[in-house]
């Protein structure tokens, strides 16, 4: 199996099932030597994305109440798709140095138990970070209210970038033009939020994962998504 096919598999599964599957698969494949460790930050940034069902059902239908012009909102996936195509083109002739023959099916309950426990550990950690950063995302708003801040809107937007699920709800509840709400939601979906970054770092613990590269890539994709969203707004609306 070539490295290109493994990276493509990681990206597709990450897009379908959503965060943090992309980072988890990247970490597992890198630990086994199936993917070059130099690509882990890039592949994680590309594959570690919110799933299409989350974007369509929660962000678009439930929060933004949008039933048309889905192409505008799906631009949050476009930069990662472009980056993935470029990455596959660069690695198209590289393959795994070691090929492991497939073994016959054996039901090993120890492996099943270990898989279940590892899955629960990841799930509980994910839920814990979501709860923690959902609380943290409200702190800037609370501070602004207590201090009688003249710019409460800025505090709300800053808080929204801590945890995306809660942040989208915050943005959609602001008294701002609808176009600006949509652009901010696109930025949140592409960037992922501070919570996603901390969770990604925890998945790659003790591996030398360079978080700053991941953050820079996510920020670049967020900016590009916003620009594409504005361009599509001008064309379609």
List where the protein language model places each region.
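Hydrophobic alpha-helical transmembrane segments
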Residues: 11-12, 43, 70-74, 127-128, ...
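C-terminal transmembrane helix pair
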Residues: 36, 52-55, 77-81, 178-237
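Alpha-helical transmembrane segments of multi-pass membrane proteins
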Residues: 9, 117, 121, 125, ...
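Transmembrane helix-loop junctions in multi-pass membrane proteins
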Residues: 57-67, 137-150, 169-177, 196-205, ...
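Membrane-embedded alpha-helical core segments of multi-pass
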Residues: 20-22, 48-57, 78-86, 90, ...
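Hydrophobic alpha-helical segments of integral membrane proteins
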Residues: 1, 8, 29, 104, ...
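Alpha-helical membrane segments and immediately flanking helix-loop junctions
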Residues: 2-64, 158-173, 182-205
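Selected transmembrane alpha-helices and immediately adjacent juxtamembrane segments
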Residues: 73-149
């Amino acid at each position: 199996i070539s490295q290109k096919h493994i990276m493509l598999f990681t990206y597709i599964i990450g897009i379908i099932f959503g965060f943090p599957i992309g980072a988890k698969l990247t970490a597992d494949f890198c630990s086994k030597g199936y993917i070059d460790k130099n690509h882990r930050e890039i592949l994680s940034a590309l594959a570690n994305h919110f799933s299409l069902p989350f974007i369509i059902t929660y962000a678009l239908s439930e929060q933004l109440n949008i039933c048309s012009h889905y192409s505008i909102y799906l631009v949050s996936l476009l930069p990662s798709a472009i980056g993935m195509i470029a990455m596959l083109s660069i690695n198209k002739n590289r393959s795994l140095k070691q090929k492991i023959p497939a073994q016959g099916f054996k039901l090993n309950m120890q492996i099943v138990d270990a898989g279940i426990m590892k899955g629960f550990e990841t799930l509980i950690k994910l839920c814990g970070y979501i709860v923690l950063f959902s609380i943290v995302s409200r702190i800037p708003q609370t501070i602004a209210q207590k201090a009688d801040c003249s710019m409460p809107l800025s505090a709300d937007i800053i808080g929204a970038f801590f945890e995306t699920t809660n942040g989208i709800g915050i943005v959609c509840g602001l008294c701002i033009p609808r176009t600006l709400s949509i652009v901010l939601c696109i930025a949140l979906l592409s960037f992922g939020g501070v919570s996603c970054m901390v969770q990604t770092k925890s998945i790659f613990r003790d591996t030398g994962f360079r978080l700053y590269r991941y953050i820079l890539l996510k920020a670049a994709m967020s900016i590009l998504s916003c620009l594409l969203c504005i361009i599509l707004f001008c064309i379609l609306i």
